[in-house]
Amino acid sequence: MITRAELLDMLASNAPQGFEAQALGLVPIVVETSGRGERSYDIYSRLLKERLVFMVGEVNDQTANLVVAQLLFLESENPDKDISLYINSPGGSVSAGMAIYDTMQFIKPDVSTLCMGLAASMGAFLLASGAKGKRFALPNSRVMIHQPLGGARGQASDIEIQAREILYLKERLNNLLAQHTGQDVERIARDTDRDNFMSSEDAKAYGLIDQVLLKRP
């Protein structure tokens, strides 16, 4: 049977550098040495020990399940210490995003949010939902807000039901975004009518974040 090391060597000799990790879905391993010997962690598990949670990629049920589980675990570890949620996401499912949002508000620790790269749609909503005064973005990140998207097929009555649900979600999200940004609901409704992209400084002025971070404090 081929070993993991042999497989990586084969890939390295036939593919560009770094490709093997992407192709196999591998995650870097961190080795820590103590008086009791060595212990290895995947990089995300090691960062979880520092209370760092990553939400990267599409917001879907799988993403929500992982983020919620980590938030609940960190609360059980220490209910009084802040959690940092790093966001680089184009958005996705409203229901999955609301599962993360409700958990952020439910748990005892403050959840600090930080945008790296892009926080769009539900990603931007969750960015703004962090603890007041603890919402950040890196200088070249982008933020985008818009109204929820949806579509329906079938009988006219079924389409009407789906349309009512989308309108309800739009109103609910606008009210929550107004609460977190300090903007009035009418402005939120206007500004989310179409894709609305912002720089990190624009997002700060709008109230989506509290500070643009150039360097770690």
From Swiss-Prot:
<dbReference type="InterPro" id="IPR023562">
    <property type="entry name" value="ClpP/TepA"/>
</dbReference>
<dbReference type="InterPro" id="IPR018215">
    <property type="entry name" value="ClpP_Ser_AS"/>
</dbReference>
<dbReference type="InterPro" id="IPR033135">
    <property type="entry name" value="ClpP_His_AS"/>
</dbReference>
<dbReference type="GO" id="GO:0004252">
    <property type="term" value="F:serine-type endopeptidase activity"/>
</dbReference>
<comment type="similarity">
    <text>Belongs to the peptidase S14 family.</text>
</comment>
<dbReference type="GO" id="GO:0005737">
    <property type="term" value="C:cytoplasm"/>
</dbReference>
<dbReference type="GO" id="GO:0009368">
    <property type="term" value="C:endopeptidase Clp complex"/>
</dbReference>
<keyword id="KW-0378">Hydrolase</keyword>
<keyword id="KW-0720">Serine protease</keyword>
<dbReference type="InterPro" id="IPR029045">
    <property type="entry name" value="ClpP/crotonase-like_dom_sf"/>
</dbReference>
<dbReference type="InterPro" id="IPR001907">
    <property type="entry name" value="ClpP"/>
</dbReference>
<comment type="function">
    <text>Cleaves peptides in various proteins in a process that requires ATP hydrolysis. Has a chymotrypsin-like activity. Plays a major role in the degradation of misfolded proteins.</text>
</comment>
<feature type="active site" description="Nucleophile">
    <location>
        <position position="121"/>
    </location>
</feature>
<dbReference type="Pfam" id="PF00574">
    <property type="entry name" value="CLP_protease"/>
</dbReference>
<feature type="active site">
    <location>
        <position position="146"/>
    </location>
</feature>
<dbReference type="GO" id="GO:0006515">
    <property type="term" value="P:protein quality control for misfolded or incompletely synthesized proteins"/>
</dbReference>
<comment type="subunit">
    <text>Fourteen ClpP subunits assemble into 2 heptameric rings which stack back to back to give a disk-like structure with a central cavity, resembling the structure of eukaryotic proteasomes.</text>
</comment>
<dbReference type="GO" id="GO:0004176">
    <property type="term" value="F:ATP-dependent peptidase activity"/>
</dbReference>
<protein>
    <recommendedName>
        <fullName>ATP-dependent Clp protease proteolytic subunit</fullName>
        <ecNumber>3.4.21.92</ecNumber>
    </recommendedName>
</protein>
<keyword id="KW-0963">Cytoplasm</keyword>
<keyword id="KW-0645">Protease</keyword>
<dbReference type="GO" id="GO:0051117">
    <property type="term" value="F:ATPase binding"/>
</dbReference>
